[in-house]
Amino acid sequence: MKPLTARQQEVFDLIKAKIDDTGMPPTRAEIARELGFRSANAAEEHLKALARKQVIEIIPGASRGIRILLQDADDHDEELGVPLIGQVAAGEPILAQEHVESHYKVDPGMFKPQADFLLRVNGESMKDIGIMDGDLLAVHKTQDVRDGQVVVARVDDDVTVKRLERKGSMVFLHAENEEFSPIEVDLTSQSLSIEGLAVGVIRSTTWM
């Protein structure tokens, strides 16, 4: 895929910003006005160029018919990959760019629900269900999880993979290894957030 021109990148960034701010892509007229094009037709030509480069899809017959195919248009070599998360800095979003070690060339749709990122497993606390040290855990980013599911949880500033159990204001994060005790979280005094649901494991490195 050819890289975007500076102008195409501006158009793409505007589309992303509008979707983030309003939930809807901009019209051609809005693109023209925001970026100083002489007409909506000029905006349309840039959209067609972005579609040819496969970073957006144009939906015919709709004034706001633009769908983003890539979240980061400048990461062309990552377009078919799932981000691999390494060390997570305290207080930072798990998908922050500085946490992404690389991308795996694997179809996220092979997992149900689909994988939004991969997390490198450290330690053997989940080995009894086949999640081993060094494995890549496929994770669907969601906070909608049920007791008994294996989740990626952030306790204060630590990220861990455990089986979830909730009892009132207490949360228990269970290991799948009898050598490890459950992590007990008192929600009245500690911070806990669910980063995602474990949906699969990759052990082979041949897909990188």
UniProtKB/Swiss-Prot annotation:
Task: Kindly report, in one word, the top-level EC class recorded for this enzyme.
Answer: hydrolase
Any single GO molecular-function term of the entry would be: serine-type endopeptidase activity
EC id = 3.4.21.88
Q: Which residues bind DNA?
A: 28-48
Task: Enumerate the UniProt keywords alphabetically.
Answer: Autocatalytic cleavage, DNA damage, DNA repair, DNA replication, DNA-binding, Hydrolase, Repressor, SOS response, Transcription, Transcription regulation
Q: Which GO terms describe its biological process?
A: DNA repair; DNA replication; negative regulation of DNA-templated transcription; proteolysis; SOS response
Can you state the subunit structure given in the record? Homodimer.
Q: What does this protein do?
A: Represses a number of genes involved in the response to DNA damage (SOS response), including recA and lexA. In the presence of single-stranded DNA, RecA interacts with LexA causing an autocatalytic cleavage which disrupts the DNA-binding part of LexA, leading to derepression of the SOS regulon and eventually DNA repair.
HAMAP family the record matches: LexA
Q: Which family does it belong to?
A: Belongs to the peptidase S24 family.
Q: Which NCBIfam families match?
A: lexA (TIGR00498)
Q: Indicate what this protein is called per its UniProt record.
A: LexA repressor
Q: Which organism is it from?
A: Aliivibrio fischeri (strain MJ11)
Q: What is the name of the gene encoding this protein? A: lexA
